[in-house]
Amino acid sequence: MSVTMRQMLEAGVHFGHQTRFWSPKMAPYIFGHRNKIHIINLEKTLVMYQEAMNYVRQLAANKGTILFVGTKRQARDIVREEAMRCGSPFVDQRWLGGMLTNFKTIKQSVKRLHDMETMMEDGTLDKLSKKEALDLQRELEKLNRSLGGIKDMKNLPDAMFVIDVGYQKGAITEARKLGIPIVGIVDSNHSPAGVDYVIPGNDDSSQAIRLYARGVADAILEGRNQAIQEIVQGDFEEADEAVAGEQG
């Protein structure tokens, strides 16, 4: 689903931070300032947003995985909802150091999480003492909070979508180290350096965050749908050729 400049205006995408907190590297994307607040140039944001969505759509069409990352308070619920809507992995609580760079160890914790979920389902819990069962439930809750969003992510993601590149410095550093492309929302107070697909915009308003996250989720679903259509189309063409061959 395409987004218009009016929708961006209504969501407050153009409101940056106080002028004294700005990053000079964001100068090309700033329109001016009003009441000591930087105003982001939505003409540029819209074009860059569309470029980022095209990239996400293409990646999803090629069976790529995009990891959603948004752990600050106003982003958590939105990131989780939109990632789940499009069946993508997400990190909505704390970014654990090594989540990408030490993925092998993280996978062991994810295996433990899966094993514990099996124990909960197959009645193993009933055979434990009350204290053991309670300890297990607590550990499961803790693991689910940290790793629940990536428990079905078998390999490193092909790209990462980040709300607030300053807040998610750890995630950005790890992705860059591994050469994982980053689609990032960059507000006027942060540097766009190291972000492959920069979307200049407000990273604090929940309306703006919803607009970005919904856009990425929609692009992923569209990309997957496009891939299915191409397969179906290919099958039809092959069938037509086969029929034509038989008739010839």
Curated annotation (Swiss-Prot):
Keyword entries, A-Z: Ribonucleoprotein, Ribosomal protein
Keyword Ribosomal protein: yes
Pfam family for this entry, one: Ribosomal_S2
A biological process term (GO) from this entry: translation
Cellular component GO terms held in the UniProt record: cytosolic small ribosomal subunit
InterPro entries according to UniProt: Ribosomal_uS2, Ribosomal_uS2_bac/mit/plastid, Ribosomal_uS2_CS, Ribosomal_uS2_flav_dom_sf
Ranges that cross the membrane: none
GO molecular function: structural constituent of ribosome
Coiled-coil spans in chain: none
KW Ribonucleoprotein (keyword) present: yes
CDD domains linked to this entry: RPS2
Record HAMAP family: Ribosomal_uS2_B
Family: Belongs to the universal ribosomal protein uS2 family.
Name used for this protein in its record: Small ribosomal subunit protein uS2
Gene: rpsB
